[in-house]
């Protein structure tokens, strides 16, 4: 995200943090991809708008600024989005994307000029294809003044509806890469789309290479070990120091650093965090996520869409 924002001309990022903020400061540091990083710490959760008000003293006094959700991955052209924001004299500009089923998100209705006219709530019933909020905004400084201080405030339910009523909210239609990686399935899909955009990296051949199966596109980090008879890929992403045991199967999955997949284990369509041990003969159901340096006992059957954290 820092690289994406930096490529669009952003030179400073403010991270609104709460839980585990001290750990995040250590992990992220104060410079990422040439961009300066500052932290605004919430003592209690302040919703989606409250953190903007809290961080006001870290922002410039006159220039518009971007707000983006932390679980969005995209290639939105933020330079052009900012230009349109200024050309239309909007107070807020929201990036929108077209999805087949907007029911998990709610729809954004616009006029022929792209001005936002109405928001429709999330629905449990699948809906026709429509535009949804992409989680990336340009806001003018005047928006900060409209956010009440000292309490949790929602951009989507309190701030934006008022701007829409006053005709001060514009949309920016994005037709490129966009994923909401807050869901395991979307996180996996986003990584796989990026994987297919670049030349995949295969393991270095050794004497027993013909007894291993590595199907492209896949990515293998440094010092990965693939056991005899193991099958990796397609669409497998193995980070550094990952071990895949003899006759194990890893497909359509993301495996983080220093994780071990035991012999004859199967991992499909899942995300396995760093330093996790998957016992021999275990089966990890599609859509699952395991993290927290856990050890899964030998022969364990993990149901599809399971979330197992320490």
Ranges and model annotations:
Residues 246-310:
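Glycine-rich hexapeptide-repeat left-handed beta-helix
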Residues 69, 112-113, 223, 229, ...:
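Residue-level recognition of short loop/turn positions
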Residues 47-49, 105-121:
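Acidic/His-rich active-site region of diverse nucleotide-sugar glycosyltransferases
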Residues 16, 40-42, 95-96, 119, ...:
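Generic beta-sheet signal
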Residues 64-66, 73, 79-86, 100-102, ...:
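Catalytic-core segments of class I nucleotidyltransferases/pyrophosphorylases
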Residues 151, 164-252:
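Extended, small-residue-rich solenoid/repeat segments and analogous flexible loops
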Residues 1-69, 78-80, 287, 291, ...:
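Conserved N-terminal catalytic core of the sugar/cofactor nucleotidyltransferase
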Residues 88-98:
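A short, conserved acidic/glycine-rich loop-to-beta-strand motif
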């Amino acid at each position: 995200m820092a690289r994406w924002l930096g490529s669009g001309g952003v030179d400073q990022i403010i991270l609104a943090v709460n839980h585990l903020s001290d750990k995040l400061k250590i992990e992220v540091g104060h410079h990422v991809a040439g961009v300066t990083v500052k932290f605004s710490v919430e003592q209690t959760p302040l919703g989606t708008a409250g953190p903007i008000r809290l961080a006001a003293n870290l922002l410039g006094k006159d220039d518009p600024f971007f707000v983006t959700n932390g679980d969005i991955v995209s290639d939105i052209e933020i330079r052009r989005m900012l230009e349109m924001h200024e050309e239309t004299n909007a107070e807020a500009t929201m990036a929108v994307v077209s999805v087949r089923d907007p029911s998990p998100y709610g729809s954004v209705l616009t006029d022929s000029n792209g001005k936002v006219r109405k928001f429709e709530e999330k629905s449990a019933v699948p809906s026709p294809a429509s535009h949804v909020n992409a989680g990336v905004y340009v806001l003018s400084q005047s928006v900060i003044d409209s956010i009440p201080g000292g309490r949790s405030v929602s951009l989507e339910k309190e701030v934006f509806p008022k701007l829409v009523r006053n005709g001060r909210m514009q949309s920016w239609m994005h037709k490129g890469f966009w994923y909401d990686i807050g869901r395991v399935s979307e996180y996996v899909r986003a990584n796989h789309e990026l994987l297919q955009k670049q030349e995949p990296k295969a393991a270095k051949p050794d004497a027993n290479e013909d007894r291993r199966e590595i199907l492209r596109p896949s990515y293998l980090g440094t010092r990965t070990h693939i056991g005899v008879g193991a099958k990796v890929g397609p669409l497998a992403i193995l980070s550094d120091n990952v071990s895949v045991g003899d006759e194990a199967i890893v497909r359509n999955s993301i495996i983080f650093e220093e994780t071990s997949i035991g012999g004859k284990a199967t991992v499909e369509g899942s995300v396995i965090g760093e330093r996790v041990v998957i016992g021999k003969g275990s089966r990890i159901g599609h859509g699952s996520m395991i993290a927290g340096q856990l050890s899964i006992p030998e022969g364990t059957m993990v149901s599809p869409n399971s979330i197992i954290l320490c």
